[in-house]
Amino acid sequence: MRKIIAEPLTKDAFAPFGDVIEAEEGTSFPINNGKTQRFHDLAKVEVGGENARVMVSIARGQPYDLPLTLNMVERHPLGSQAFMPLTSSPFLVIVCPDESGRPGVPRAFITKPGQGVNYARNTWHGVLTPIGEEQDFLIVDRGGEGNNLEEFFFPEPYEIHLPER
């Protein structure tokens, strides 16, 4: 089995795959008479296809055991897909570059508290992967007609590990 070590999630490292969603001072301004700080325009939501619309959902994910065996990735050709945790627990983010319509070698990231991700339209990615405990996530993605899911099963799985401490 091929081994992948998860790396810390950063905006620069994740940029080829989408957006890191997090509250940073450079992206905020006060609203509501100064009582609220708005962290603005943190991700590009993409929707395409017939009768496309933006959906907001909540998912409750069960934790995965580590190391994680990665057999499959998926992508959404008609829209982006964002996951924002509603807890402070970390989760794994797995993405692959596209290589002529197939996923390339995966990269794995581990989030820190307060980080979420927005997978850009057509980005190969792993499934929602909470670690440590059950977690709830706010999901922003595409609804509408048309097939918005493509799955790829690796002929040989990868094994995802957290970095050594």
Swiss-Prot record:
What enzyme class is recorded for this protein?
A: lyase
- Keywords carried by this UniProt record: Lyase, Purine metabolism
Q: Under which pathway is this protein filed?
A: Nitrogen metabolism; (S)-allantoin degradation
Query: Which cofactors are required for activity?
Result: Ni(2+)
The catalysed reaction is: (S)-ureidoglycolate = urea + glyoxylate
One GO biological process from the UniProt record? purine nucleobase catabolic process
TM spans (from-to)? none
Q: Which domain of life is it from?
A: Bacteria
- The answer on whether this UniProt entry bears the keyword Ribonucleoprotein reads no
Its EC number(s): 4.3.2.3
- Protein family according to the UniProt entry: Belongs to the ureidoglycolate lyase family.
Self-association and partners: Homodimer.
Q: What does this protein do?
A: Catalyzes the catabolism of the allantoin degradation intermediate (S)-ureidoglycolate, generating urea and glyoxylate. Involved in the utilization of allantoin as nitrogen source.
Specify the protein name.
Ureidoglycolate lyase
User: What species is given as this protein's source?
Assistant: Chelativorans sp. (strain BNC1)
Per UniProt, what is the name of the gene that codes for the protein in this document?
allA
